[in-house]
Design a protein with these regions (language model features):
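Nucleic-acid substrate recognition interfaces
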Residues: 1-384
């Protein structure tokens, strides 16, 4: 039986004492994560050296001497000495260090499965967060209870009804938030089937062009806020390091980055929700976003569009509502191929927005690409 899990991010309203406690708990989580990363590397190196020596001398490996790292062993090791070496850890919830190490273990699992890069150390001011298991907090009305702290006000009620699984407390744009995961008592109401299909060509001048001829404009939040962003960045760089004025400038800059991110995500949520509601099958390109942003002339515009976030939202919403997502390979010539006869126009450039094929069909570049994507998408990302 499928589990229906939803997350709700709610802004918190801590007083100065509570905000200071959040910062301390985040510091404990960060210290634990970074210590565990070094310990993981040390154990892995020692284990590898022992195996290499056994192989070099032709000696059988003694399993009792193996020291392959795991998050469970490292958590146990930290517990053995944290009371003496890190007594300040006892002032915050036990989940802060323990779940941080569990998250490191998950990061290594994803790395070895080829799903993500090698884990990096967490940075202060960038990765200010800690997690809580469901037995370590409770929610009542517009308040959340934090261990060793008490009740903290929230700006809204929890949206979902069901079993609360976990929470993550994090700082973004100078504000504190709680991301709460809930397993729903019953599945959400699904969008009705429409029997319609659509191909989507993502672009830079507009967010997306659909195979039915619709053009979805971009909100371009970064472009609209770029002048203000540059001014705040310049102001921050001129402030003396370690000064209160520099910290204030950093907060202003961080809040603007957060505002831009929220505007972009909100626009993408509206677009992806509408697409999943209207179409039963959606075909997209498997874009190499990392490679695309290497183009200095287009990198800012591509980042402003949020292609990765668009795809992520589209996939999880399609799964929720039983819709299908198909994709074509990143090297498929969707723009150069005539959607009518299949002929390739090798001379097509980015500047050419329209063109006529030898079969006398006049194409709009992006609409033609979207039609080809719908016709030739064959890789299932989400199946009904």
């Amino acid at each position: 039986m499928s589990r229906f899990i939803r997350g709700h991010v709610i802004q918190l309203l801590p007083n100065n004492k509570q905000a200071s406690h959040f910062a301390q708990a985040s510091g404990v989580a960060r210290l634990s994560y970074n210590w565990a990363l070094k310990e993981w590397q040390r154990q892995y190196k020692a284990d590898k050296e022992y195996r290499d020596q056994c192989d070099y001398y032709g000696v059988q490996v003694d399993k009792k001497l193996l020291n392959k790292p795991s998050e469970a062993k490292i958590r146990k090791h930290l517990n053995s000495f944290k009371r003496e070496k890190y007594p300040f850890m006892l002032k915050v919830t036990k989940c802060a260090p323990q779940l941080a190490i569990k998250q490191l273990g998950s990061s290594f699992d994803r790395f070895f499965n080829g799903q993500s890069k090698y884990p990096k150390p967490r940075k202060k001011g960038v990765d200010d967060r800690f997690s809580l298991s469901n037995d370590q907090f409770s929610i009542k009305d517009r308040k959340i209870s934090i261990p060793n702290l008490g009740w903290v006000k929230m700006t809204e009620d929890l949206r979902y009804q069901g079993k609360i699984l976990s929470a993550k407390i994090f700082k973004q744009g100078g504000k504190w938030f709680a991301s709460i995961a809930v397993e729903l008592n019953q599945p959400e109401k699904l969008h009705p089937k429409t029997g319609l299909s659509v191909g989507i060509d993502l672009g830079v001048s507009s967010l997306a062009t659909l195979s039915n001829g619709e053009v979805v404009p971009s909100s371009a939040p970064l472009k609209k806020q770029l002048a203000k962003l540059r001014r705040l960045a310049k102001s921050f760089s001129r402030k003396k390091k370690g000064s209160q004025n520099r910290e204030k400038a950093k907060t202003k800059l961080s809040r603007l980055h957060y505002k831009i991110s929220c505007l972009r995500k909100n626009n993408l949520h509206q677009v992806t929700s509408d697409l999943v509601k209207r179409f039963d099958l959606i075909a997209i390109e498997d874009l190499n976003v990392k490679g695309m942003v290497q183009n200095r002339k287009l990198s800012r515009a591509i980042s402003d569009m949020g292609f990765y976030e668009f795809k992520r939202q589209l996939i999880y919403k399609a799964k929720q509502h039983g819709k299908s997502i198909l994709s074509v390979g990143r090297f498929f010539p969707s723009s150069k191929m005539c959607s009518n006869c299949g002929e390739l126009n090798q001379n097509l450039t980015l500047a050419m927005r329209e063109g006529r094929c030898s079969c006398n069909t006049l194409h709009h570049r992006d609409i033609n690409a979207a039609i080809n994507i719908l016709k030739h998408a064959d890789k299932e990302l989400v199946a009904t």
